[in-house]
């Protein structure tokens, strides 16, 4: 199924950015577990700083409601449907580009594939859909935490600017409230907005407390599954496991083992596709967003050369908004791997 | 299924490096197509330079035989079973390490997961299994070629040494026969062997002639599928699509469109997870192999600190042997995506 | 996935009978196809005579709305979400049995499995959910018809009463409007209602115009798939393909072949799991419904022996209401098999 | 995948009756479990009485060998490959019918679908393949038995002859060794062979000791899965769950519940697709085999009317040989359902 992921607990997402609603359907989940709209709402709101501060001005309410699969706040074992209403449908932002293919976007490939041009701001390809992954993924957040697993994301680079490691200690919330006071970041972001430009970014994720033996060779190794799902996030270009193995020889990167544990973790917690109990280290590279308000050469549906300019709201650094999405998808991947391992115990 | 891949035509591989046989089972293939053992054998032999020249001295015959699913050399539509006999079973190479966990290898994680130590030279986790992927994948090679698709792999880096671009014009065979005469490469490889070291490598794959519209958003995007399968290859650490997006802003990497085509291809042929008709550009990073004949600290099954030394044959640059494996898996991925697209025509 | 079916075009259904909504999500469908709520609404309304005439008095509006996956009435290729609001939520009907396990129903097994008792009239196990299968399945109805395929269902037996074959010529609608005038049926149904009883039934489905070569041996034979999906319908107990093979020898049931075609069709259009071009003949047996207003011995959640009496509305012959459900699921199965065959052309 | 079944532990079968070998590949199985060729061989031999006594004279050795996935007789967690060599390849038996489509067989439909005529005695469609299901399924037999589950098959009818219930107490082996002494059966079988005829049969399976809560609504109900797999067996025409619900009203078939348990078991151990702890009751109807040595009208590949006569060995009652196949597939289904339930504990 093209629009589902998860081997045991399966998430299906649906909805277009400028359609009526977006949402997620969770199948294969436990019964008799408390889930509350409040908790999911809180996590969705966590997504907002990443979408609005410095970023796009689009103001969504993202009000989520659970419609099926629960009774008196507990799951029944039946599929759980969550819906988020789209309030902020400013199709007008995008009207002037309706007949143009925005370079770097899905417009051209979606038109060729689906013989169809849904110009309403990206439609199904829009990053708005990722709200569904956050809403559904956070349902597993506590289950993961209760097993001692902590997922933390760090912004390593914005454009060419390397983020000072001392900021890596901050929780992501505090990091963002302090963003304004980190001068270099403030400057680089503002320059971007003023020059109608956007920047690449590198996000690092470290997962602590993960039990060993997760992952299923040969073709469902944990790094295979993680890359499959995380590279489905818009604007991702690259994924890397462990610390940088470029230009290295084996003496430089060997992880020796003592009876007190591993002496290092170059491999980033994964050996032969299975977790070894050490922290997972994953790095993802995001390209700069392609919607800017600068002029850019493209063609329209009649294949005529034109110059395009997006008047809509755009994101100077789209990688930042991806952080809650990455974490949510990781909760889903991890709970699935943990349940899969349980089968054989 | 942990040991299968492919959405329509499915490949299952099996067998251990020091077991009796290894092989592949192909299900969902066309009927009435000629396939010959000779052709598969030829492709398997192409794998040998990558495994023996400069590399491991292990000398496999890799003689393949088709046992089911054909009649008078044509496929019947039933599953096709290919078997390769293991002749070169030198378990003795590995005996002294049987109770030790070789760092960087699957030993430790496989022991934890399967409660079982198959010390016969890596067993199921060994790179030997990749011969099965080559044998099965090449069945689709001609189908892909007949559609005008050409898959080419290039070695970009060995250790810190960047390979001169002029060599990128060589077919891979010619490249390898000339390797000996490329002094820098010769030197770096020999140094490695003499110092019992091994090197990382970067492989670039360029795919020309691929039709647009391949790939299925949101979770079966073509980059998702490719990363899922290619990162299942031993020693892979990173995958990257398109040209380097690090430290960039959008002006530097925009692919403008004219009615004569795209003006550039930074995105490497993929937009929003769907091919756009331009060449696919994929880069994979391999870590240095962990089996060297240098001493390395580890523990044995009784959790006692010891020093380990592999007397077996090892590979100074494991990325090189992966090239035919990458190409074979790509044939399988591409034929599946092409057939999937066919459904909707 | 427990709550999805369909190999290429996948339907997921969700919702409980006395929850807020029920619905279906269609993934993998064509783009650029017209679908309208009116057409789906019409088909849902066709379901009503089967649910209300003679049958349960529960009066649902079954008003369907499409929320995603369309733009200007055409499919975009993205998942299509249909929702049906539950208006007629008379939980009070069921209150007096809330702590009792209704024999023959899902109550007992669902309680054991999900550790949870959703007493709201059957919840997820209720036949109400089948409205989702009708709503989604009819989307494929025209596609099937345009290929010359006609699916027709006939009621062969109600209780012990065999329906006169002459009525098999009627379209189902006409059959039902005439039901009142078919005395034997009228009598048997009324007796049922008066004595608070319910009856078994046998439904025969004949599919004409189906192309040969549909079905995928060995484990996705068309009879395997059909039985898998149709036996998921509530109250089904048996499925049979072809004409009755009981107590037969081979001379009695051989289908000889002439160059003008088959001389008979005992095998009901399927040979070795693949269609042969002849009409498919399928027969399904439904058990009598278990909810009646007669007293029946059972236990409550405290495992105390009690007598139960359902005051809610019940169905004297549940097999009748299944007819549109059977047909809808068959449209889904058939379109999937036809698309699967297309891959190999 | 067309040639695999099983949701967690997956079996893939392959091979043609007159090809080199047949076999099975088991993926997703436990590690560290003892399996021995002897045990599998013993179970395969159990299959022989069902295939040779009274039945076909084809004498296979059915010698099985395990090639991968084990080390020192214990499973490693890697895929397990079992191969059975075909010794008794009398293609000559079938030569005279090579250009004819044997009515009632797969010949015609396989020719249309695969554009290919593998006349070697049924090829992939032959019942010989079922040996693979027996070989793989018996691996799970002990696991099931250790959970207190007993699977027993009974022959209820051969042709029109109803088997006296007193024989239902015999284990199947003893039943068969006594077959010769059960006069009615002896007579009916001999008449068959003399008149070159064959008979239908009804097999009843009763499964005791199965835990409740197995089965996954809505589309992976246990009856759905069982029917899907069992109807893939050659010559099956019908499957029925529970006791006969034909011509019944609800008073006749209600299963009341007391705190001491159910008062009856008309539903045959399944409610709403989930086991309720009572014995499962399944009945399967087999058609008479179509290969007889009587003349029968058919066409050849040139579409010319001819008369066909099979000189090969044929089976007077093909349902009998299916018994070990049914049981093996049930072990596979049950272990999968049990493991699936384990996920949620």
UniProtKB/Swiss-Prot annotation, chains A, B, C, D:
It comes from the Bacteria. InterPro entries: Chorismate_synth, Chorismate_synth_AroC_sf, Chorismate_synthase_CS. CDD domains: Chorismate_synthase (cd07304). Pathway: Metabolic intermediate biosynthesis; chorismate biosynthesis; chorismate from D-erythrose 4-phosphate and phosphoenolpyruvate: step 7/7. Its cofactor is FMNH2. Pfam families: Chorismate_synt (PF01264). GO terms for molecular function: chorismate synthase activity; FMN binding. One of its GO terms (cellular component) is cytosol. The keyword Thylakoid does not apply. It catalyses: 5-O-(1-carboxyvinyl)-3-phosphoshikimate = chorismate + phosphate. Its EC number is 4.2.3.5. SUPFAM superfamilies: Chorismate synthase, AroC. One of its GO terms (biological process) is aromatic amino acid family biosynthetic process. Keywords: Amino-acid biosynthesis, Aromatic amino acid biosynthesis, Lyase. The keyword tRNA processing does not apply. Homotetramer. NCBIfam families: aroC, PRK05382.1. Belongs to the chorismate synthase family. This is Chorismate synthase.
């Amino acid at each position: 199924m093209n629009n589902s992921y998860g081997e045991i607990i399966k998430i299906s997402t649906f909805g277009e950015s400028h359609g009526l609603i977006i949402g997620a359907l969770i199948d294969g989940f436990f019964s008799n577990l408390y889930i509350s709209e409040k908790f999911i709402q809180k996590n969705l709101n966590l997504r907002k700083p990443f979408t609005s501060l410095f970023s796009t001005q689009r103001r969504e309410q993202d009000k989520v409601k659970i419609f099926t699969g629960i009774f008196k706040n507990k799951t029944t074992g039946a599929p759980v449907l969550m819906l988020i209403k789209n309030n902020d449908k400013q199709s007008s932002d995008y009207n002037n580009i309706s007949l143009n293919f925005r370079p770097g976007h899905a417009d051209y490939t979606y038109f060729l594939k689906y013989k169809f041009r849904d110009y309403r701001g990206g439609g199904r390809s829009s990053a708005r859909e990722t709200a569904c992954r956050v809403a559904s993924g956070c349902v597993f957040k506590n289950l993961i935490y209760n097993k001692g697993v902590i997922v933390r994301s760090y912004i390593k680079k914005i454009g060419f600017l390397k983020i000072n490691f001392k900021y890596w200690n901050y929780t992501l919330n505090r990091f963002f409230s302090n963003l304004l006071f980190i001068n270099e970041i403030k400057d680089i972001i503002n320059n971007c907005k003023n020059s109608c430009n956007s920047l690449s970014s590198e996000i690092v994720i470290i997962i602590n407390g993960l039990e060993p033996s997760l992952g299923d060779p040969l073709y469902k190794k944990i790094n295979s599954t993680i890359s499959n799902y995380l590279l489905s996030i818009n604007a991702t270009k690259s994924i890397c496991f462990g610390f940088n193995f470029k230009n290295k020889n084996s003496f430089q990167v060997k992880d020796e083992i003592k009876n007190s544990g591993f002496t290092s973790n170059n491999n980033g917690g994964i050996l032969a596709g299975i977790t070894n109990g050490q922290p997972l280290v994953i790095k993802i590279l995001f390209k700069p967003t392609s919607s800017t308000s600068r002029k850019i050469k493209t063609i329209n549906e009649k294949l005529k050369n034109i110059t395009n300019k997006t008047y809509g709201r755009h994101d100077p650094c789209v990688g930042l908004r991806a952080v809650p999405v990455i974490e949510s998808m990781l909760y889903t991947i991890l709970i699935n791997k943990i349940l899969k391992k349980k089968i054989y115990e």
